[in-house]
Amino acid sequence: ISLGADPGVAVKAACHNAARYFLLNNRGAIAPGYLGDFVIIDDFQHFEIEMVYKRGVLMYDGQLRDFPAPEIDPYLVKRAHDTFHVAHLTAEDFSDGRPHAVIGMIPGEIVTQDAGYADHADPEQDILKIAVIERHKNTHHIGLGYIKGYGLKRGAVATSISHDSHNIIVVGATDEDMAAAANRIVENRGGITVMENGQVLGEVTLSIAGIMSDDSLVMVNSALEDAKDEAFGLGVSRGIDPFMTLSFMALPVIPSLRITTRGVFDVSSQRYI
C-alpha cells in the first residue's frame, strides 16, 4: 500500500487470496459460511489493530477479553508433554571418524549448495558440525554432517523445531557442546538452547510436543530474542535467523543438501551422500 497499491486489492491478496491458495475456504473474508475471524484496524496507513474477532466473538479491543478455553483430553495433554525418548548423549555420539558432506548455506535463502566434504569442524574457516538426533522412538539414530555459512565460532545451538519430523538438530564448534545442548533440549522437553562450555547462555522452553509453549507470548518472545542475541554473540552470522535457518536444514525436500537422522541428503539426486 505504501508503494501505491490499492488498499482493497492489497488486503484481498493478503487475506482472501492466501486463504484460497491453502484451501482454507472458510477463512479470508467476512461473508455467510465463513468463520468470522477478522481484525479491525485504524486506517490503511498505520494498520494498528483496534479489535480482534475470533469466530465472530470479540477477543481484543485494547485489552484481551476473557474467553472459554477449549477442553482437551487429559491423556492427550500428557502425551503432548512426553515426546522426547532419547538416551543421554555424549561427545562420542557426534564423532564417527569419517568425512561427511558440507552443506553450504546461501545468505538470505533456505536453499543450500554442495560445499564438498570435511572430516572435522574448523570454526575459523566457518566449517561446523551439524547433527540430527531422532527423538520420538529412542532409536539412537544420529545423522552427521558439516555446514558452512552459519558463522558460529564457539559453543553450540540446538532446537527441536526441525521441519517436518521435529527431531533435535544441533550445530556446534565442539562435540562436547553439541552433546550438552542436545541433552538440554531433552531435559526441557523441547525448545531452543544456546550453549558454551556446558553452560546455558540462552534458551526457549517448548514443552508441548517440543514445538509449542504454554507460557505467554511476551515471555516466549523475550526468551527468543535473548537467545538470538546469545547466538549472535557466539559468532552466528548477523544476516541469518539463528534458529529459523537451522530448522529448515532438516527439511529434505528443498535443494540442494539437507540433513536427516541418516545423514546428509542430496535432494536433487534423491540419495544420501
Predicted regions and their residues:
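Active-site microenvironment of metallo-dependent hydrolases
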Residues: I1-I273
